[in-house]
């Protein structure tokens, strides 16, 4: 089997102008970035914004192994298969962050014969969205520090600045830094730090904004610091929301590319799902819904993180609600949840599949709480055995959830036909009756308790002293009615990454909150979740290169 990049480079790409004709996008609707990439103009977005939306399919997964379970690959393969069976389909995905690409992932544009192309460009600088978000974020930092240097008319307490700088790399050395050193001409010394770009609130804002005006309003509502009297300082107080919007005026437009099979793909925005809401942009998803009969999208990590946030945070901003949710599972991950060591996952172990099924079962039950029908997709691997597959199908039958084996990595669209047909059957039965887990009127404590007890399976929530004080403060500021975005390990339902399967009776500890008032949610921090990742001992970057003719090597 060829590597992902070898497969990608063997495909003869069609001009993007030709690819998008099938969904009614013309040449004048595009802002081209070469022959194979484009941004969609606001003229076209506005032209279709009142059209009736098509069907929406959300792809999520069980709690993943460190290698991931193939959500993006399955999403792409499903979209290709839907097109192959005659359903006009688009896909809406997140764009990858360069940090993890250079770190552990090596690439994030699908895999095998289910990829979005050109994968080298998408994984590297693409159309410059990450650069624009990084620049806007750091422009805010520079303007904030300049305000303090020039007299601090707003009375900002430099000890209580909560806005950090960002860079689109994994760089642990930048987590805690001191700025303003070198004497009075260089600013006022203070502690600062860097997050990875995809953790920036500006990334979340870009992905939730519905147009330029909404983007500007959300940017204005960002809290950057507190005054000496402990009242919040917003971007609007600095009067710089216009400048930040200007920097992002092109980045807000969705990017168009194609799959190996020529399915039009909107790839736009990329917040992490463990420290942010983990979904691609509202603009991309909404536009796809109005251009196609079926839209396939994904939410990051497992359904306890990405799908919950998609349904509680993103869906209220969409023109329609999901018609079906596809939960991707792999037998290797189920065996890991069943107690098998990572080194032994390739060995047949039917009992471990049965034991690990508790994880998948809870995810199915959780999605049903939102009133949406579920389909399980088994992402097929070479080491899977007939006995293990039969056991999983039997277990799914017992809880009355349809299940299909999919081999889109190896077989592309053909490997997803059975899954596509099952999804269409579920969608066209029209059983979806979406409801949020909590209401806006619930307090922050109530929202978190519902997520912990009903989604995670936990017993209760423990709020540390700082979090308790913040709850009182946030209520005074009127922030207590915002949705909650849980920052939690992706590997477990709990806040302990080693507690696999479907644990019960545990507590979730909230150590502090981070207000993301521009994005419109409050982040609750649990465990040791990092907003600036580090690199592994042997980063993927060590195997990357470029040939004399400019061909990328080592992306996978």
From Swiss-Prot:
Its EC number is 6.3.4.3. The keyword Hydrolase does not apply. One of its GO terms (biological process) is tetrahydrofolate interconversion. This is Formate--tetrahydrofolate ligase. Belongs to the formate--tetrahydrofolate ligase family. InterPro entries: Formate_THF_ligase, Formate_THF_ligase_CS, P-loop_NTPase. It comes from the Bacteria. It catalyses: (6S)-5,6,7,8-tetrahydrofolate + formate + ATP = (6R)-10-formyltetrahydrofolate + ADP + phosphate. Pathway: One-carbon metabolism; tetrahydrofolate interconversion. Disulfide bonds: none annotated. Gene3D superfamilies: Domain 2, N(10)-formyltetrahydrofolate synthetase (3.30.1510.10), Formyltetrahydrofolate synthetase, domain 3 (3.10.410.10), P-loop containing nucleotide triphosphate hydrolases (3.40.50.300).
